[in-house]
Amino acid sequence: MVQLNQDFIKSIAKDMPAHLSMDDFISYSSKPLRPSIRINTLKISSQDFIALMAPKGWTLEPIPWCQDGFWISLDSDVQLGNTVEHLQGLFYIQEASSMLPPIALFSTKTDKAEHTILDMASAPGSKTTQIAAMMDNSGLLIANEYSSSRVKVLHANVLRMGVSNTALTHFDARVFGEYLYDQFDAILLDAPCSGEGTIRKDPLALNNWGLAENSAIAETQKALLESAFLALKTGGSLVYSTCALSKLENQDVCEHLRSTFPEAVEFESLATLFPDADKACTDEGFLHVWPQIYDSEGFFIAKITKTCDVERQKPEPKRQKNFPFTPISSKVELELRQYFKQTFDIDIPTDDMLMVRDLEYWLFPAGMKTLIGKMRFQRIGVKLADGLKKGFKARHEAIVALAEKSTGYELSQAQAIQYLMGRDIPLVDGGKPQGELIVTYHGSALGVAKHLGSRLKNTLPRDLVRDKIADSDASTTA
């Protein structure tokens, strides 16, 4: 059994609702988490994924608050993260409770196609990619991460999941209220926290728990929430979430925001967000998810509406200069569109921005037009292709983000494994060479290969090549 920090137990006992049992909390904290996944609807429907994986022994139990989330039971010890289906972005390994904040963000049905949304603390990318899927890759999603090493992980997951409507930033998120004041239709602040709710995943999470440290964390959370509120448009929605359990990092932080902007802050009740949500609902309408309620990680979710204008707290910063991208010429645009259509049967979206930098051709979300110059961006949209002396060379990320389902040369599982291990694929009766083409598995793009007649020449980027791939219906590896 996990040995819980006794100072933590004494402190959390004051915050636990009277109808919940500390014995149950300790018991559930000692149990391993049920593994859970979220199906990536940018690439496959949940119905099709379930039908696809059932013959492989995957039993999927619906998570009540996320229609694309499932607890998973397997017939054998499959290494989920090393399966072809995971590497090609058909699903994300995501804890069930962490699917709640994006669901709360979109609890009110709105037209997301025109929305500009901010994910203030994004890495590793589970909620960012969930939001992008819920937006169906439309609109604009700004994904920020303060840690430089975690930005790389975030980008890798955005690429793997086929997300194209996102721009990445690398800032202390306290700057957003200043630089992008009154800019966003919706904001998710999944704030850095003490991690009290993650004990089932990380038995060492509470080893260094201390009230003084948590109080310092709460002050940072308050500053981040104020920044988010200033960056939010009037009438917009803000979700504040943590994987902490104490009121100090949750209710108290939200109450601080209301006391700071009393006329503008309204708490929206989440009591009807999903069946039995009321079991975790507080008097304020927040969801305070304790591990024993839904057999999950601990989590906190609050939804806040900005009901009236709030004055800018600092003068508007000077515009950023020397933006390195320029719009491509109409001639090059036509050639680029023809190349993608004729070679890969891909129609480049017409509403987005086609930009160039040093013979690199990029697709920016249309919503970026109003943000260029206001802030520096780490990476915007999708890199489509590199310019050659004659023609173009498509980039892997463009193919996996823009290719339609079932467009390409379908591989068997054995061939897909060989492809992801960077190997060429021999062909029997391959016919005449066909040049560049998309290779797919389960009808979803894996990448590009060059058809040489007798084999498919592998062009997978070296940083994506894996030494071992797990069989998704057994624990053996190739």
Swiss-Prot record:
S-adenosyl-L-methionine binds at residues 121-127, 145, 172, 190. GO terms for biological process: rRNA base methylation. The keyword Protein biosynthesis does not apply. PROSITE patterns: NOL1_NOP2_SUN (PS01153), SAM_MT_RSMB_NOP (PS51686). InterPro entries: Methyltr_RsmF_N (IPR031341), MeTrfase_RsmB-F_NOP2_cat (IPR049560), MeTrfase_RsmB-F_NOP2_dom (IPR001678), Nol1_Nop2_Fmu_2 (IPR027391), Nop2p (IPR011023), RCMT (IPR023267), rRNA_ssu_MeTfrase_F (IPR023545), RsmB/NOL1/NOP2-like_CS (IPR018314). It comes from the Bacteria. Its main location: cytoplasm. Keywords: Cytoplasm, Methyltransferase, RNA-binding, rRNA processing, S-adenosyl-L-methionine, Transferase. Pfam families: Methyltr_RsmB-F, Methyltr_RsmF_N, Methyltranf_PUA, YebU_pre-PUA_dom. Its EC number is 2.1.1.178. It is an enzyme of class 2 (transferase). GO terms for cellular component: cytoplasm. It is found in: Cytoplasm. Disulfide bonds: none annotated. The active site is at 243 (nucleophile). GO terms for molecular function: RNA binding; rRNA (cytosine-C5-)-methyltransferase activity. It catalyses: cytidine(1407) in 16S rRNA + S-adenosyl-L-methionine = 5-methylcytidine(1407) in 16S rRNA + S-adenosyl-L-homocysteine + H(+). Specifically methylates the cytosine at position 1407 (m5C1407) of 16S rRNA. Belongs to the class I-like SAM-binding methyltransferase superfamily. RsmB/NOP family. This is Ribosomal RNA small subunit methyltransferase F.
